[in-house]
Amino acid sequence: MNFKTALICFALLLIGTLCSAYSNQERQRDSRRVAEIMRTSLDDNTKINRIQELLTIYNRMAPSLRPDERARIDRFISRHTEGIIVDGVPSQGGARKIFKKTLSPAAKSVATGFFTELGASLASLFTSWFPTTTTERNH
């Protein structure tokens, strides 16, 4: 009886892991979404508003990245999100979020630079996973 219980638990664990993995379909969908976000975000406010969506996509793909890729992007995100101040108080705990507030021109410049670099990093990763996707769209 103990062996059967252990086998069932192992099977459930294996099935759960396989079902929660980042599938190729999800990667392709996120790849298309990142490309769309980057292509349609023309003004500063749109870029700032879409940072959270890029972070959400990154959080979905992060477990399937190589450790060095993940560490590089995590350092980049931490460098730009740890110092975010909301109503004069640093943000604390929970998922990283960019809060939409009235930003000074300097802060807006930093935020749009963050958007551009994060989007380019994600697009580069997707291009390495799906090298034909980019070339097919250009033809």
From Swiss-Prot:
Disulphide-bonded residues: none
Main localisation: secreted
InterPro entries for the chain: Turandot (IPR010825)
Gene Ontology CC: extracellular space
Record GO biological process: cellular response to heat; cellular response to UV; innate immune response; response to bacterium; response to heat; response to UV
Signal peptide, first to last residue: 1-21
Keyword terms, alphabetized: Immunity, Innate immunity, Secreted, Signal
Job of this protein: A humoral factor that may play a role in stress tolerance.
Family as reported in the entry's similarity comment: Belongs to the Turandot family.
Record protein name field: Protein Turandot B
Gene behind the chain: TotB
